[in-house]
């Protein structure tokens, strides 16, 4: 065996052998410390993550920087392959376990950051609320309580009534009358109207009625009862013309014939202009 080969084997064994248990121990510690990290502050968890992330790249660089032997026997090659396969299996297992721990730490850190932001944002809001609660305190006390069921006009009237104030109290005079008693000697008698009955008619008036002197009686009902036709004639009499002459009298039949002739002539005259227009268009 060459001295170079013997030196290379222990170096690889030293890197593969002692470092692997350290990784396992590190895994166990990470699993055990998960509940402890939740109870601790977020600062410690962030520092621990940074240290673990810084340690990983160093291990990978050391494994890559190791010199591989040029001439190895078949048994040594098989041993190296087994060691490499073990290290490759352990690396993804570490990667799979680490992301589980990171989100919890990030959630805890994020929760505290959100709580801190809420606490900082809550401070100015509290101040504003205190200012608002102090400012409307004075006018609320001065305003009277308004009933919710009333409209705007009723509420305005109530406000005006409140400004007027209550009614003034008038002191009642309890003085008693000490003078002489008042007596009313007057009496009332019912007298019937004169002429309401024959008994109450005065005697002189009866004599005048018997003589019928100086008394104008109602006119006699000589006129006939008036019907609707008579009323129409009486109303239309104001609009009639004077009586025509005897020579110019015409019968009703002649007047009706003249009216028909006038209507026919009017229709002919109105029909003539459209014919003239048609002739002009034809030309």
From Swiss-Prot:
Cross-link (Glycyl lysine isopeptide (Lys-Gly) (interchain with G-Cter in SUMO2)): 32
Keyword Acetylation: yes
Compositional bias (Basic residues): 21-30
Feature: compositional bias, Polar residues: 1-15
Positions of post-translational Phosphothreonine modification: 135
Coiled-coil segments on the chain, per record: none
Modified residues (Phosphoserine): 87, 133, 222, 243
Molecular function terms, GO-annotated: calcium-dependent cysteine-type endopeptidase inhibitor activity
Keyword Cell membrane: no
Name used for this protein in its record: Calpastatin
């Amino acid at each position: 065996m060459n001295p170079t080969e013997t030196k290379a084997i222990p170096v690889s064994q030293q890197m593969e052998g002692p470092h692997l248990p350290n990784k396992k121990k590190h895994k166990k510690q990470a699993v055990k410390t998960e509940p402890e990290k939740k109870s601790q502050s977020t600062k410690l968890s962030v520092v621990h993550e940074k240290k673990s992330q810084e340690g990983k790249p160093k291990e990978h660089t050391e494994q890559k920087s190791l010199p591989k032997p040029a001439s190895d026997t078949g048994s040594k090659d098989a041993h190296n392959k087994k060691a490499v396969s073990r290290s490759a299996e352990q690396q993804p297992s570490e990667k799979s376990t680490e992301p589980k721990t990171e989100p919890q730490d990030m959630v805890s850190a994020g929760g505290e950051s959100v709580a801190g932001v809420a606490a900082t944002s809550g401070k100015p809001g509290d101040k504003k609320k205190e200012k608002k609660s102090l400012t409307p305190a004075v006018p609320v006390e001065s305003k009277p309580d308004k009933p919710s069921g009333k409209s705007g006009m009723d509420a305005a009237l109530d406000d005006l009534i409140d400004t007027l104030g209550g009614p003034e109290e008038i002191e009642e005079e309890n003085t008693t009358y000490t003078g002489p008693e008042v007596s009313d000697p007057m009496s009332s008698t019912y007298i019937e109207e004169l002429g309401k009955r024959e008994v109450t008619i005065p005697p002189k008036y009866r004599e005048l009625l018997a003589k019928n002197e100086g008394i104008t009686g109602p006119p006699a009902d000589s006129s006939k009862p008036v019907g609707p036709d008579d009323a129409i004639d009486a109303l239309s009499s104001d609009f009639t013309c004077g009586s025509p002459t005897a020579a110019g009298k015409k019968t009703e039949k002649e007047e009706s014939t003249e009216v028909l002739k006038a209507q026919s002539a009017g229709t002919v005259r109105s029909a003539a202009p459209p014919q003239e227009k048609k002739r002009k268009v034809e030309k």
